[in-house]
């Protein structure tokens, strides 16, 4: 990719998708600068790597850049974008830059409404264990690598493919995974599920004729698009007809044990005994996708088993903060704290089911910050249903993510609906800054507290730890 452009500037470099691309380009020898509205652990790390990082957006930040990269979170009237356009500096969408990176290697792209980050991480980990030394760009921090991106020396690059803005249609992988298709980010698709499915079909059609589509057989919407996928398909899941199928699945604390039966067309491969260092059936499916990729690429079974058993997880995906003391005023004892990024009812239900499977005799308490008013509105009844499945609920105001408030879909409305449903009495905490103390006021000995959401609630577990 070496050419006349040597300096690339990232507007919003602290974002998970942006920071990974910036890091890989830096390791390829480019001069990288970036700006973000807020300082964070991500921006500090990028600065330590050698990037020039500015906090705040200013026209002067683009000086000397040959191109600037933006995400969909960056508005068109951003001063750095305006300065670049005025100076005829190319303004490149994040997905287009990711597509350019993928042209350097053989791309494996992971798409789907839920499970992308974990599945991408599992694929990268299994390929690394198999000696393929992949490059990866992930939407979360891979714990074993301490980063969400790495430049490998092998021929493969593993990336997350983002359907939220349809930008995954810029990518040209040789292998494409689709974990599931669910109604989320529907503004992009005109609130038309058929258009959403068509986008996923188009995503698979961008594979070359020798490419491979790895599709989850357990998802009804994925099954519906299969007849329209014209590339070779490998199916995976718990369904008996899946080519890569998990059987005899058992939960063992926060680990899962299962047997994988594999069929390569008409050839039956040896069964694979797997111990996965993640909880929940949803993670069994994520692991099956990685096994399907690894099997197709010839990774040794022993390496697959080793990688899955030793997998250390991804930041904010069922991250266990450990056991903390219950205040003496509430009887003392300990409670277990878990942090999770889930913000859609389907993701939340899967995580809560995993928690129940891991700790079947304990009370599951959910501390949740809804993310976006439009999602809360569109999935309102589903949120009420999944929140009602917890034994205790602490609910904050909606994290707006730039949206205007909707009174009928705010935190209070959700709390009222949950109370009327009668399954659980919620504690409404309007200010998320007060949530850590509210959690400590609520917990009792033996509780498992799952802190969940995609917004500012991410700071809560550390604050609970400090207060406890």
Swiss-Prot record:
Domain of life, per lineage: Bacteria
Transmembrane spans: none
A molecular function (GO) term: ATP binding
Subcellular location: Cytoplasm
One GO cellular component term: cytoplasm
Positions annotated to bind ATP: 112-118
EC number in record: 6.3.2.8
Leading EC class: ligase
Assigned protein family: Belongs to the MurCDEF family.
Protein name: UDP-N-acetylmuramate--L-alanine ligase
The organism of origin for this protein: Bordetella pertussis (strain Tohama I / ATCC BAA-589 / NCTC 13251)
Gene assigned in the entry: murC
């Amino acid at each position: 990719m070496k050419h006349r452009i040597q300096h690339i500037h990232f507007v919003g470099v602290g974002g998970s998708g942006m920071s990974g691309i910036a890091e890989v380009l830096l390791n390829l020898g480019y001069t990288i600068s970036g700006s973000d509205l807020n300082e964070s652990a991500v921006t500090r790390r990028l600065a330590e790597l050698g990037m020039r990082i500015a906090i705040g957006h200013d026209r002067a930040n683009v000086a000397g850049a040959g191109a600037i990269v933006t995400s969909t979170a960056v508005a068109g009237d951003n001063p750095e974008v305006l300065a670049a356009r005025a100076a005829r500096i190319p303004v490149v969408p994040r997905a287009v830059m990711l597509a350019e990176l993928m042209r350097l290697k053989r791309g494996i792209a992971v798409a789907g409404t839920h499970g992308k980050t974990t599945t991408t991480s599992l694929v990268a980990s299994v390929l690394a264990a198999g000696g393929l030394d992949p490059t990866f760009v992930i939407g979360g921090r891979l714990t074993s690598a301490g980063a969400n991106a790495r430049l490998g020396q092998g021929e493969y690059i593993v990336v997350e493919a983002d359907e939220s803005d349809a930008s995954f249609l810029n990518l040209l992988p040789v292998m494409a995974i689709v974990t599931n298709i669910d109604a989320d980010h529907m503004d992009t698709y005109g609130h038309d599920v058929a258009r959403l499915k068509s986008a996923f079909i188009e995503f698979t059609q961008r594979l070359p004729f020798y490419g491979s589509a790895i599709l989850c057989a357990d998802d009804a919407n994925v099954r519906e698009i299969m007849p329209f996928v014209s590339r070779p398909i490998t199916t995976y899941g718990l369904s008996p007809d899946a080519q890569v199928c998990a059987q005899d699945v058992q939960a063992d604390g926060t680990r899962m044990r299962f047997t994988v039966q594999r069929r390569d067309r008409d050839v039956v491969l040896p069964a694979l005994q797997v111990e996965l260092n993640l909880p929940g059936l949803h993670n069994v499916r994520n692991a099956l996708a990685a096994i399907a990729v690894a099997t197709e690429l010839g990774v040794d079974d022993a390496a697959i088993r080793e990688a899955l058993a030793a997998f250390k997880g991804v930041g904010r995906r069922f991250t266990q903060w450990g056991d903390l003391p219950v205040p003496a005023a509430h009887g003392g004892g300990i409670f277990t704290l878990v942090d999770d990024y889930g913000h859609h009812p389907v993701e939340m239900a899967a995580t809560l089911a995993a928690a129940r499977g891991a700790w079947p005799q304990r009370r599951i308490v959910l501390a949740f910050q809804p993310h976006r008013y439009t999602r809360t509105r569109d999935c309102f009844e589903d949120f009420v249903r999944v929140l009602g499945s917890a034994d205790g609920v602490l609910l904050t105001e909606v994290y707006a993510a730039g949206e205007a408030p909707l009174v009928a879909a705010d935190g209070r409305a959700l709390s009222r609906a949950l109370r009327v449903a009668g399954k659980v009495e919620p504690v409404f905490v309007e200010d998320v800054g007060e949530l850590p103390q509210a959690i400590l006021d609520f917990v009792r000995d033996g509780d498992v507290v799952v802190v969940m959401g995609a917004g500012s609630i991410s700071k809560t577990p550390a604050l609970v730890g400090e207060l406890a």
